[in-house]
């Protein structure tokens, strides 16, 4: 379960940013998770509950936004629906598709106790 190491990294990054801004605690961590990652959302949420203990994020809420996978043909530019079509090559020209979105994880922002200001990480 690699979600625990990812959750620990998320907490460490959020905590470092919060400390840099003089925060005493973190209330919210907003995450964008690509649907084409190998990360299981429920496992990540469970791992976050463990990873946040005894940190500035001890009482933080994790909000996960799922980013849909978007693919595009680098040759002809066609953007098919990868979930509906379940394809690895362009339906128009047959060349391989390149993934444009939905295969990464991004810590979008955190909210901390200092004046309830949210800032990007």
Locations of the language-model features?
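Long, charged N-terminal interaction/targeting segments
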Residues: 1-59
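Short loop/turn motifs enriched for small/polar and acidic residues
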Residues: 32-36, 65-69, 108-110
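Internal catalytic or translocation cores that form aromatic/hydrophobic pockets or channels
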Residues: 60-62, 71, 80
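Flanking scaffold residues of small Cys/His-coordinated metal-binding clusters
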Residues: 67-68, 84-85, 102
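Cys/His-enriched microdomains
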Residues: 71, 88, 105
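Short cysteine-rich clusters marking metal-coordination/redox-active sites
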Residues: 73-76, 90-93
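Short functional micro-motifs and their immediate structural scaffolds
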Residues: 81, 98
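Long, charge-rich boundary regions
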Residues: 106-121
């Amino acid at each position: 379960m690699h979600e625990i190491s990812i959750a620990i990294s998320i907490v460490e990054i959020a905590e470092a940013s919060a400390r840099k801004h003089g925060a005493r605690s973190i209330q919210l961590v907003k995450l964008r998770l690509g649907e084409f990652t190998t990360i299981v959302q429920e496992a990540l949420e469970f791992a976050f509950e463990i990873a946040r203990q005894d940190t500035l994020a001890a009482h933080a809420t994790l909000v996960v936004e799922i980013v849909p996978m978007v693919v595009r043909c680098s040759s002809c530019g066609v953007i098919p629906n990868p979930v509906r079509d379940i394809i690895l090559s362009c339906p128009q020209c047959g060349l391989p598709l390149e993934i444009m979105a939905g295969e990464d994880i991004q810590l979008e922002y955190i909210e901390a106790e200092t004046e309830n200001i949210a800032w990007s990480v």
